[in-house]
Design a protein with these regions (language model features):
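N-terminal secretory signal peptides that target proteins for export/translocation
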Residues: 1-7
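A short, flexible low-complexity segment enriched in Lys/Arg and Gly/Pro that occurs
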Residues: 34-46
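Non-catalytic cap/lid and distal C-terminal segments of serine-dependent acyl enzymes
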Residues: 46-50, 54-56, 62-387
Length: 387
């Protein structure tokens, strides 16, 4: 493992919010008929969805440029202009946290030893059961993942700290927002752990296995293999109270963030997702959850007692629509997130749902506009332990 650290300066680092969750353009074709990547046509731009479409949730439309209040619950529509919030710019008069980086090798993992698809190959829809994806080119393969750990300047060594775990790291936008929000006492003094994925995307890849699997496996990986390293390397003490633990991610990283809490409410109670992949993307197929993360709004949340989970979620009006990937009618990200809002409301969850106009999948501008409010909303009601 390699590790190093740097002190965040007064310049906003070029954050990467490309949390990729889309499927390849020709995913429904047999792999042996796939043309070279360079010859495949580009995926058409998704249609722009109207937030007032019949069947969508009833939502409060905010003036352009505004975001909901940090204590507001329910459904909101934000306008087409997405300026970065002031908290997304590093301030010279604000204490800057330190970001440490280290790498993890698949050779050291008992939970995720590593898989990958052959280059330029994808799955094909099962001709008998359109809800299944057939992948024949996935094989064991090693990987190295990067982990970034943000420790705020206000952290007192030895004190138990709340924390947030993020997918598809490193997420430097998160670290900048936390610097400013912590300084303004709008969120608790917390550690942020931004974990890189194990490479690839979608069915048959390591990232797909980690993020799209409907189980507590990824939460267990974080608990058993990541958090102990964070504590030992950087001399921080992470809380074991699920009220002081949050997860976040975009696309498949978003559905993964929910899975971490859903399957392990003993570990996490707070979830934040951008363009969550609440669609049928799980592989390998699991008869217990045959429709993958589409099952959250289809059966799991409606048919289960409400869990102690607080969730903030967002979708863009031009978010992903992949109707031909598996011909299962379960690959519309806008519909999936709209239905998430419906079932969360019906079950009495504390949630805030944002429908963003003029926004694509895991839209960077939307994240820069909304992340400070989202984080402040996420940590509402948290009571830090007595000093």
């Amino acid at each position: 493992m390699k590790n190093f650290a740097y002190l965040k300066g007064a310049v906003l680092f070029g954050a990467t919010s490309a949390l990729i969750g889309c499927l390849p353009p020709a995913l429904g074709q047999p792999t042996n008929s796939m043309p070279p990547v360079s010859e495949r046509p580009k995926r058409p731009t998704p249609p722009t969805r109207d937030p007032h479409t019949p069947g969508y949730v009833t939502a409060t439309e905010l003036p352009d440029g505004e975001v909901p209040a940090a204590d507001a619950e329910g459904n909101f529509i934000i306008g087409a202009t997405h300026h970065a919030a002031p908290e997304m710019v590093a301030q010279t008069n604000v204490p800057q946290g330190t970001v440490y980086n280290f790498t993890m090798s698949s050779a050291d993992s008992k939970i995720f030893p590593g898989i990958a698809r052959d280059p330029n190959t994808f799955g094909t829809g099962d001709p008998i059961d359109p809800t299944r994806m057939v992948v024949t080119t996935s094989h064991p393969e090693a990987y190295t993942r990067r982990v970034a750990v943000y420790v705020p300047q206000q952290y007192v060594p030895g004190r138990v700290a709340p924390f947030i775990v993020g997918a598809d790291g490193p997420d430097r936008m998160l670290f900048t927002a936390l610097d400013n929000l912590i300084a303004e006492h709008r969120v608790p003094v917390m550690i942020a752990i931004s974990i890189g994925n194990g490479s690839g995307d979608a069915q048959g890849s390591e990232r797909g296995l980690e993020y799209d699997t409907m189980s507590g496996r990824y939460a267990e990986f974080v608990e058993q293999e990541v958090l102990p390293l964070v504590e030992s390397k950087y001399h921080v003490t992470l809380t074991t109270d699920p009220e002081g633990r949050a997860t976040m991610g975009g696309s498949s990283g978003g559905s993964c963030a929910l899975s971490m809490a859903w399957y392990h409410t003993d570990l996490y109670h707070r979830v934040l997702t951008y363009s969550g992949t609440y669609v049928n993307q799980q592989w390998p197929h699991n008869e217990e959850t045959p429709h993958g993360a589409w099952g959250y709004h289809e059966t799991l949340i409606p048919n289960s007692a409400a869990k102690p989970i607080r969730i903030w979620l967002e979708v863009g009006d031009r978010d992903l629509l992949n109707p031909n990937s598996m011909h299962d009618n379960m690959h519309d990200w806008v519909v999936a997130n709209e239905r998430m809002a419906q079932v969360l409301a019906a079950k009495g969850y504390h949630y805030q749902f944002i429908f963003a106009r003029n926004a694509g999948h895991t839209d960077r501008a939307v994240k820069q506009q909304t992340l400070p409010e989202a984080l402040e909303w996420l940590w509402q009601g948290y009571q830090p332990p007595a000093k």
